């Protein structure tokens, strides 16, 4: 499995060793780029040079950041400094749902401020929700228990405490952490490349660049017809609207809108859905390529 890629070299873990490999030219010719997380077949020559010969089928992948075969995505959200942005949270969850990746929300810095509203929104949506404080260690054991045997991508905006959380999960990692800029109110980008980190308790963590620039019109695109299925709390109401072509944004007889009125779906989540629908509704099939 590729655990890191940098400068045209790919570092492949196999049989408890790490091999520095180059990708065969055939991959460039066919437009295939090896991703961190790819399971690959490699060859080892007599002079110890190694090459990636084959990339095995991926169960999923992200384009930005380039990482594949993810089991779960832990989205770290801070209660303050920086404040949570529901639309960015919901876009990230939707991308995970569309790719078949289990989304998990971890709220950080809970020693500084309450998080009741966030908890209400996402527990109502059926999204696994955890609260931690990297400063005190509260809640970290629960996150550690989620990781063995899985590839977990850790993501979130700059400054939310991803690296601090990973350092708490496995102190051997000693990841650089970024202090919040007092002037900008944002953290320095301390994660410069995607790398799979082998965890002491089992499993791998992908510490990925922040998702602050995620855009459904570029990179991780979701088809208009798939978007409702990326909001798992919509599922009981899909297919029962008055009109088969219902967009679930404003139509009369929409079961999703009725569920929002009945407080079975949180208004914040529906607002995010409507904003995302506006972004994708006019994208043509050929633009998805």
PLM feature spans:
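Canonical P-loop GTPase G-domain recognition
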Residues: 109-160
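Short aromatic-glycine-enriched beta-strand elements
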Residues: 8-12
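A short macromolecule-binding patch
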Residues: 18-24
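Helix-rich effector regions associated with P-loop NTPase G domains
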Residues: 25, 31-48, 56-73, 78, ...
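Short, glycine-rich nucleotide/cofactor-binding loops
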Residues: 77-86
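A conserved segment at the C-terminal end of the G1
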Residues: 162-178
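Structural detector for short beta-strands of small beta-barrel domains
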Residues: 1-6
